[in-house]
């Protein structure tokens, strides 16, 4: 059996000393949304609880203002 090296998860917002996550920063928010449009959980991204709450709030605000989609593009 081949074992693989699991990369250590870390909070990007803590490393960059981010004070608050902005809902207008669409490029950052898109990294934390799945293909289907759902918010990716912190156990997968490695984001701390404080920033995960801010992230969820920012994504929901961006969705409300139509900056981000609620779901994927149906075809």
UniProtKB/Swiss-Prot annotation:
Any one GO molecular function term: structural constituent of ribosome
UniProt modified residues of type N-acetylalanine: 2
Pfam families: Ribosomal_S18
Keywords, comma-separated and alphabetical: Acetylation, Ribonucleoprotein, Ribosomal protein, RNA-binding, rRNA-binding
Single biological process term from Gene Ontology: translation
GO CC term (a single one): cytosolic small ribosomal subunit
PROSITE patterns (alphabetical): RIBOSOMAL_S18
Disulfide bond annotation, renumbered to this chain: none
Role noted for this protein: Binds as a heterodimer with protein bS6 to the central domain of the 16S rRNA, where it helps stabilize the platform of the 30S subunit.
Family affiliation: Belongs to the bacterial ribosomal protein bS18 family.
Assembly description: Part of the 30S ribosomal subunit. Forms a tight heterodimer with protein bS6.
HAMAP family in the record: Ribosomal_bS18
Name of the protein described by the UniProt record: Small ribosomal subunit protein bS18
Gene name in the database record: rpsR
